[in-house]
From Swiss-Prot:
The lineage of its organism: Archaea, Methanobacteriati, Methanobacteriota, Stenosarchaea group, Methanomicrobia. Belongs to the eukaryotic RecA-like protein family. ATP binds at residues 107-114. The gene is radA. It comes from Methanosarcina mazei (strain ATCC BAA-159 / DSM 3647 / Goe1 / Go1 / JCM 11833 / OCM 88). One of its GO terms (biological process) is DNA recombination. This is DNA repair and recombination protein RadA. HAMAP family: RadA_arch.
Length: 325
């Protein structure tokens, strides 16, 4: 992350810098990845001025140009891996859940999506030695499924697993939850999450995990019928790219849970499909399909990844949290 102040950019004086900060653009990286219309609207400046500021920020932050594959490889060394707490699951994911990427968990009710999200919210706060990223968590809760009691159980489970004393209250203090009441509010909360992440970063508690549980609940309820599909997908596309940008800006994992639908015309194979269409499919970096099995067992299938082969892992959802079966 660049240490260059906003005021050092050509065309940005103290007054403009203040407007940008008020609009949530606290770093030159945040400015560099914005669109001119977005910057002009939120910071109340002209669109041509916004375009010049963005170009200057891209040059200063070294964003937007071509680079060779070896440099991309070098930069990817900054990508962190968050443990799931299960050996088989971690191996399937190439070491864990990646930062700077969106991981989608989809499956029918009771398949364990929220349980995985809760477990990751605990694991991310552990140090790197124990597979964590030593960071805070932001949760956008659309279905009122966050349960602090479950976090307490999982922290106690980790205490037993590693033979160390962990305080559940400290873990809960590092989890920041917001309830989203409609799709507009949900999108707005991503902007609020950027502001909160900047504040926490200054306090030495960087946000390393953003969870949206669930991604499509409000969109599915508000946009009914084929006539509203185009509007829904356009809005959803903006939301998904906002989440992706959050992951890039803060080197954080972004995990979204998703609902499913049955495809009645599927005569062979599993008729279960995630909702959200191609927008979610193309924007999510990793897609995981969760299925119920006997008792506590859950089967997690890696359906899509840019670098990993398809695979399956069997885990158990116990009182102590997510464990190897």
């Amino acid at each position: 992350m660049s240490e260059i102040a906003l005021e050092e950019l050509p065309g940005v004086g103290p007054a403009t810098a203040e407007k940008l900060k008020e609009a949530g653009f606290n770093t030159i990286e945040a400015v560099a990845v914005a669109s001119p219309s977005e910057l002009a609207t939120t910071a109340e400046i002209g669109e041509s001025t916004a375009a010049k500021i963005i170009n200057a920020a891209r040059q200063a932050a070294d964003i937007g140009g071509f680079e060779t594959g070896d440099l991309v490889l070098e930069r990817r060394k900054l990508v962190g891996k968050l443990t799931t707490g299960c050996t088989e699951f971690d191996e399937m994911m190439g070491g864990g859940i990646e930062t700077q990427a969106i991981t989608e968990l989809y499956g029918e009710f009771g398949s364990g999506k929220t349980q995985v999200a809760h477990q990751l919210a605990v694991n991310v706060q552990m140090d790197r030695e124990h597979g964590g990223l030593g960071g805070s968590v932001i949760i956008i809760d659309t279905e009122n499924t966050f349960r602090p009691e479950r976090i307490t159980q999982m922290v106690n489970g980790l205490s037993e697993k590693y033979g160390m004393e962990l305080n559940p209250e400290e873990f809960l203090q590092n989890i920041h939850v917001a309830r989203a009441y409609n799709s507009n509010h949900q999108i707005l909360l991503v902007d609020s999450a950027v502001d909160l992440a900047n504040e926490l970063k200054e306090m030495g508690k960087p946000v390393r995990l953003l969870i949206v549980d669930s991604l499509m609940a409000h969109f599915r309820a508000e946009y009914v019928g084929r006539g509203t599909l185009a509007d829904r997908q356009q809005k959803l596309n903006k939301h998904m790219h906002g989440l992706l940008r959050f992951g890039d800006l803060f080197n954080a994992c972004v995990v979204v849970t998703n609902q499913v639908m049955a495809k009645p015309d599927a005569f062979f194979g599993d008729p279960t499909r995630p909702i959200g269409g191609h927008i979610v499919g193309h924007t999510a970096t990793f897609r995981l399909y969760l299925r119920k099995s006997k008792g506590e067992k859950r089967i997690i299938r890696l359906v899509d990844s840019p670098s990993l082969p398809e695979g399956e892992a069997v885990v158990a959802v116990t009182t102590a949290g997510l464990t190897d079966q």
